[in-house]
């Protein structure tokens, strides 16, 4: 028998008060235990008001108990879906929760399966070693490599790099580009190339005499460089000498030569290790002038130069001379290298000023005008 309203028309104390518009509905555990059901627990509730669009299991169980208590049915007789189904479609609260759990499990399984396949594919790629061809094949292919492509060829694999270390490779390269009309120094002639000592360095030097693409590179060497060379910074001065040049001019010119050893690229990158040629080919790769270069400055007058051998070259500038007709070269030497872009004071170090300057040239160790020992 239904109970009527309380005295004076006031609502019953157990009546559920509806929340104000715009406030979020929060689920509390004691509300579920007491069998309290709100609009937010249904599937067609406003998602802007409800924090999550998914019905929690605790809420679904509370709804089931509420339906059972209202209908007076046992749990084993009537399913909750039938009790909740009215004139319209059923609100599949429990099914929606189970379906979402199943979907999440399927997504998780697919993600794990995809990761396993990706890992298995990566292991298969790592395990695939490929074909390893014998050294004779690479030596045969090296006979068709241009001199400017030797570096790219050596980077193909370790066997290709090993081939470029052999004496046979450099000897064949020399014979392939040698011509009878080539004007070569005594050390670079065929009768001297039978020596294995410094064979690689001598072949590279000879290519700048015989190979046209290499010779064209050094032919475009202006008397005064367009920009001040920056590769000599922190180089060590190994040797210094000057000589008198008698030419068409009434007064002779003077040539000042500074031999530098550049800072090793391994020291710049702080890399002490690296590929070393095989022991049996160390004599072939020996080069006393490795990382060396020659700075040659020609002046119109003789200029006294202080002793700078053994010092570190830290500053190099080329400016216009005071007469606006020639150039002025300033060299600064220090006892130790300068790192971190630290600027030097004008009074620090040993300064060498050459003025007026006729020409400034920089020669690497493979340049034809670089002086090298005949014993190399």
UniProtKB/Swiss-Prot annotation:
Keywords of the record: Membrane, Transmembrane, Transmembrane helix
Membrane topology (UniProt): Single-pass membrane protein
Keyword Ion transport appears in the UniProt entry: no
A GO CC annotation given for this chain: membrane
Classification via InterPro entries: F-box-like_dom_sf, TMEM183
Tissues expressing this chain: Expressed in brain, lung, pancreas, thymus, intestine and blood. Not detected in heart, placenta, liver, muscle, kidney, spleen, prostate, testis, ovary and colon.
Compartments where located: Membrane
Disordered: annotated segments: 1-20, 102-127
Transmembrane segments: 300-320
Similarity field: Belongs to the TMEM183 family.
Additional notes on this entry: This gene was derived from TMEM183A through retroposition after the divergence of human and chimpanzee.
Record's protein name: Putative transmembrane protein 183BP
